[in-house]
Regions:
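Conserved N-terminal alpha-helix of the aminotransferase class I/II PLP-enzyme fold
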Residues: 64-97
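PLP-dependent class I/II
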Residues: 2-4, 12-14, 19-22, 26-32, ...
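Substrate/cofactor-recognition hotspot
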Residues: 8
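Glycine-rich loop-to-alpha-helix module at the N-terminal edge of alpha/beta enzyme cores
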Residues: 19, 36, 52, 58-64, ...
Length: 399
């Protein structure tokens, strides 16, 4: 076999996608699996968005367009930022990408030189460290505890800053914890950013899924003077149940946006043209469907929290947003299954639930914390109730 590039030797498949794929494979075999591993809403894309896409196809929006995206969509993104956050951006400060994931990847490729360090707060979304490594950077993981709402001590973050540190990635509401960073914490991060001249990549993909139903916030909300240092990632996937449409965006200073656009122009070019029209309608139409979906997720979060409290040995903080709950399950480690297999970590715990209870969850090690598993409540209340019963029964068999 020919020699592979050194930079991809540590590349691993996405753990979340792997678990979801295994659960779906079991279902295809006729096995009843309750999938609580999914990273996407269980709702369908609203009809008015689909109709806009169909119309775009009928109108002939099927040719190449400019790499940064439709001007009308970029204007809609700017307007949405001003409405939701009070931030003013111009279309040349927006790059439309093939999902928010590409926005992150473009930015990291544009800003990281070999050996540069980027701070990541644990627990983190699975792809951050891998993307940094592909860009030949070094992910510096800063650990946090559930007891402190997964907000690391600012002193601990500062200890991890070296002359090689160039930036920090923030994600709030968080995947996997479902928690929202406090204003006080964000202000502290802002001071470190100023002190050490860092950039901030703010992954706001879940910003509308807040269970306090307040307007979205990010670090610019508490430190607007950081505008030139903050780059915002968002998209339509989670908020509008459009994961398969693959439309995201990066917003920030036009100099960096132009570089990211050049990178994209040499890889995928523009995101799908007619899908962009659907995204535009999603942003410019009534947001009532978003509010309805968020309300349902809030109700499910409350239900799941109540149900899990009945299982001894499982600890968690009730989610404040997203559609995830991060549950500490390490109390069950070192126990054995009825077949004599030891539960050693979050992977073996998750495998046991899938094999014994037919419930799929994601091992916490994928997010940087092996004591936890991520449970998605992007599923019906009926299935959530069934799943918790099955989990409780399976855990009761451990010795």
């Amino acid at each position: 076999m020919f020699k592979l590039a050194e930079r991809i030797k540590t590349l691993k498949p996405s753990a979340t996608l792997a678990v979801d794929a295994k659960a779906k494979a079991l279902k295809e075999q006729g096995i009843d699996v309750i999938n609580l591993s999914a990273g996407e809403p269980d709702f369908d894309t609203p009809e008015y968005i689909k109709e806009a896409c169909k119309k775009a196809l009928d109108d002939g929006l099927t040719k190449y367009i400019a790499t940064p995206g439709l001007l009308s969509l970029r204007k809609a993104i700017c307007q949405r930022f001003e409405t939701d956050y009070g931030f003013k951006y111009t279309p040349d400060e927006v790059l439309v990408t093939t999902g928010a994931k590409q926005a992150i990847f473009n930015f990291l490729l544009a800003t990281i030189n070999k050996g540069d360090e980027v701070l990541i707060l644990s627990p983190y979304w699975v792809s951050y460290p891998v993307m940094i490594e592909i860009a030949e950077g070094v992910p510096k993981i800063v650990f946090s505890s559930m007891e402190k709402n997964f907000e690391p001590d600012l002193s601990e973050i500062e200890k991890n800053i070296t002359p090689k540190t160039i930036g920090i990635i923030l994600n709030s509401p968080s995947n996997p914890t479902g928690l929202i960073y406090s204003d006080e914490f964000l202000k502290g991060i802002a001071e470190l950013v100023k002190k050490y001249n860092l950039w901030v990549l703010s992954d706001d993909i879940y910003d509308k899924l807040r269970f306090d139903f307040k307007p979205p916030k990010n670090i610019l909300s508490v430190a607007p003077d950081l505008r030139e240092k903050v780059f915002i990632v968002n998209g339509v996937s989670k908020t509008y149940a459009m994961t398969g449409w693959r439309i995201g965006w990066l917003v920030g200073s036009k100099e960096i946006i132009k570089v990211c656009s050049n990178i994209q122009g040499q890889s995928t070019s523009h995101a799908t043209s007619f899908a962009q029209k659907g995204a535009e309608i999603a942003l410019t139409s009534s947001q009532d469907e978003v509010k309805k979906m968020c309300k349902v997720f809030a109700e499910r979060a409350k239900l799941l929290s109540q149900l899990l409290k009945e299982i001894p040995g499982i600890d968690f903080i009730p989610p404040q947003g997203t559609f995830y709950l991060f549950a500490k399950v390490s109390a069950y480690y070192n126990k054995k299954t009825p077949e004599g297999k030891e539960i050693k970590d979050s992977v073996s715990f998750s495998e046991y639930l899938l094999d014994s209870a037919r419930v799929a969850v994601v091992p916490g090690i994928a997010f940087g914390n092996d004591e936890f598993v991520r449970i998605s409540f992007a599923n019906s209340e009926e299935n959530l109730k069934k799943a918790v019963i099955k989990i409780k029964e399976a855990l009761g068999k451990l010795k």
